[in-house]
From Swiss-Prot:
This is RNA-binding protein KhpA. Belongs to the KhpA RNA-binding protein family. Forms a complex with KhpB. Residues 29-75 form the KH domain. It comes from Clostridium perfringens (strain 13 / Type A). The gene is khpA. Its main location: cytoplasm. PANTHER family: RNA-BINDING PROTEIN KHPA, UPF0109 PROTEIN SCO5592. InterPro entries: KH_dom-like_a/b, KH_sf_prok-type, KhpA. PROSITE patterns: KH_TYPE_1 (PS50084). The keyword Plastid does not apply. A probable RNA chaperone. Forms a complex with KhpB which binds to cellular RNA and controls its expression. Plays a role in peptidoglycan (PG) homeostasis and cell length regulation. GO terms for cellular component: cytoplasm. One of its GO terms (molecular function) is RNA binding.
Length: 75
């Protein structure tokens, strides 16, 4: 899951070297914290959050396949 978010985010931004994904294991879910450079934040979020929603949808679909609950937070 972590690698999936990283690949998607790196393909969207101008500075792929500044993309970092931190995985936090919770009791019932996995939290993926996506960090990008401030200049690329708009590209990852998109207009009205459409790209962020699309990233979350793709990750959620992959998580369901593995019977897990994953939350993507953009920091």
């Amino acid at each position: 899951m972590k690698e999936l978010v990283e690949i998607i985010a790196k393909s969207l931004v101008d500075k792929p070297e500044d993309v970092h994904v931190n995985e936090v294991l919770g009791e019932e879910s996995i939290i993926l914290e996506l960090k990008v450079s401030p200049e690329d934040m708009g590209k990852v979020i998109g207009k009205q959050g459409r790209i962020a929603k699309a990233i979350r949808t793709v990750v959620k679909a992959a998580a369901i396949k593995e019977n897990k609950k994953v939350v993507v937070e953009i920091i």
